[in-house]
C-alpha cells in the first residue's frame, strides 16, 4: 500500500504489510455498554456477502496538531491542510481495502479541507473529542450530510468510537476519534499502517457494531474468542503485556467481527448500493468427530475451484477469559487456538 512522506509533496512510500517496526501501545476507550444493538448471544452460522458494495459517507476532521504534523509549512506547494488531506486519504484507502475485502463496505470521504483545522489554538477540539466532533460535524455539515464521523489527532496513542453500533444514529454517529504519535519505538521513520488499522480501522469497526475479540480481559458479550490479546483488527495485539500474541494486529477481521458488522448494517437503512460480480458457494463441514483431550489434529478442506481467488482461515468461536496463565489444551471453554492470517493454504494443524 501507499503512504505519503511527511514534508515531501512528490514522494510516497510503497510497501507491503510487515511486522518489522513498532509504535507505542494503543488504548481503546470504547465502552461496549454504549451500544445501540439488540444484544444476541454468540452463535456460529453461515455468513454470505451479497453481490453489492454498500457505501457510507464518512466525514473526517482533524485537530490542529494533526494538520501541523503532516504539513510542511510551505504554501507554495500546497497548504498544510492539503498536506493533511493526503494523509487522511492514505489512511482511508487502507481502511477501505480491508472493509471492502471482508465486509463489502466502502467509506466515501464527503468532507473537505475546511474540517482539517490548521491551528491547535483555534480548532474546536479541547480534549472532549467525542462531543466536540459531534457538534462540529452537525454544525458544519448537518446531520443529514454524513453517515459517520471520525477525528484524527496527533498525540499519545488513544482512541474511542463513542459507541458500539451507531453509524447513521443521530447525535452518536460523529463521536469517533483516533490519536497517534506517528513514530515507531526504535525512533525510525514512521512507515507502516498501524494508525490506519490498529486505531482507525478498530474504532470504525466499533462504530459499525463490532465488539472486542480478545480474551485476556473477559467481556460478557460472547465474542472473547481470541486467546490473550488476540491478533485481528478488533483485538488488542501489542498492548496487553504478557498476554500479547504479537506487536500489532493483522489486516483482517475475525469471524465474530464480520458477523457483528454485517448484522448491524442489515439493521439500518442508510448507505447506497453498487452491484458487483461475486460467486456464492456452500461449504459442507462434514461429520463431527470426538478426539482424545490433548490430541494434535489437522483441519482440512478441499479447496474451491479457481483456488487462486480464495484464501482460508480456521477460527475458534468459544468465548471465555484466556490469558498466558491458563492457555492450554485442557480448557473446557475458551480459545485453544489463535486466528492466523488467511492464506491460500486450506488446511490447518492444531497446535501450530
What are these regions (language model features)?
Residues 285, 289-299:
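Short, solvent-exposed loop/linker segments at the N-terminal edge
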Residues 110-131, 170-252:
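The catalytic-center signature of Zn2+-dependent metalloproteases
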Residues 108, 313-352:
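Exoplasmic/lumenal beta-rich domain surfaces
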Residues 11-167:
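Fold-level signature of zinc-dependent metallopeptidase catalytic domains
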Amino acid at each position: 500500500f501507499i503512504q505519503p512522506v511527511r514534508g515531501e509533496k512528490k514522494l510516497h512510500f510503497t510497501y507491503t504489510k510487515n511486522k518489522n517496526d513498532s509504535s507505542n501501545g494503543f488504548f481503546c476507550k470504547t465502552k461496549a455498554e454504549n451500544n445501540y444493538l439488540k444484544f444476541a448471544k454468540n452463535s456460529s452460522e453461515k455468513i454470505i456477502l451479497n453481490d453489492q458494495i454498500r457505501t457510507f459517507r464518512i466525514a473526517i476532521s482533524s485537530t490542529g496538531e494533526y494538520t501541523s504534523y503532516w504539513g510542511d509549512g510551505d504554501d507554495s506547494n500546497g497548504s498544510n491542510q492539503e498536506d493533511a488531506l493526503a494523509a487522511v486519504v492514505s489512511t482511508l484507502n487502507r481502511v477501505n481495502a480491508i472493509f471492502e475485502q471482508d465486509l463489502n463496505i466502502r467509506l466515501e470521504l464527503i468532507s473537505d479541507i475546511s474540517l482539517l483545522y490548521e491551528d491547535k489554538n483555534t480548532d474546536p477540539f479541547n480534549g472532549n473529542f467525542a462531543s466536540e466532533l459531534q457538534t462540529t460535524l452537525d454544525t458544519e455539515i448537518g446531520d443529514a450530510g454524513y453517515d459517520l464521523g471520525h477525528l484524527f489527532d496527533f498525540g499519545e496513542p488513544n482512541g474511542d468510537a463513542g459507541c458500539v453500533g451507531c453509524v447513521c444514529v443521530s447525535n452518536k454517529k460523529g463521536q469517533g476519534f483516533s490519536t497517534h504519535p506517528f513514530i515507531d519505538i526504535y525512533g525510525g521513520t514512521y512507515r507502516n499502517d498501524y494508525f490506519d488499522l490498529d486505531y482507525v480501522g478498530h474504532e470504525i469497526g466499533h462504530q459499525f457494531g463490532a465488539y472486542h475479540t480478545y480474551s485476556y480481559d473477559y467481556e460478557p458479550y460472547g465474542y472473547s474468542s481470541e486467546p490473550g490479546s488476540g491478533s485481528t483488527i478488533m483485538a488488542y495485539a501489542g498492548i496487553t503485556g504478557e498476554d500479547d500474541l504479537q506487536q500489532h494486529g493483522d489486516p483482517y477481521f475475525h469471524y465474530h467481527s464480520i458477523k457483528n458488522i454485517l448484522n448491524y448494517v442489515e439493521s439500518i437503512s442508510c448507505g447506497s448500493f453498487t452491484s458487483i460480480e461475486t460467486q456464492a458457494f456452500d461449504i459442507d463441514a462434514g461429520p463431527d468427530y470426538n478426539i482424545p483431550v490433548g490430541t494434535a489434529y489437522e483441519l482440512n478442506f478441499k479447496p474451491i475451484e479457481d483456488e487462486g481467488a480464495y484464501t482460508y482461515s480456521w477460527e475458534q468461536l468459544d468465548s471465555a477469559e484466556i490469558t498466558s496463565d491458563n492457555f492450554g489444551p485442557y480448557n473446557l471453554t475458551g480459545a485453544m487456538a489463535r486466528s492466523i492470517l488467511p492464506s491460500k493454504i486450506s488446511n490447518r494443524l492444531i497446535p501450530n
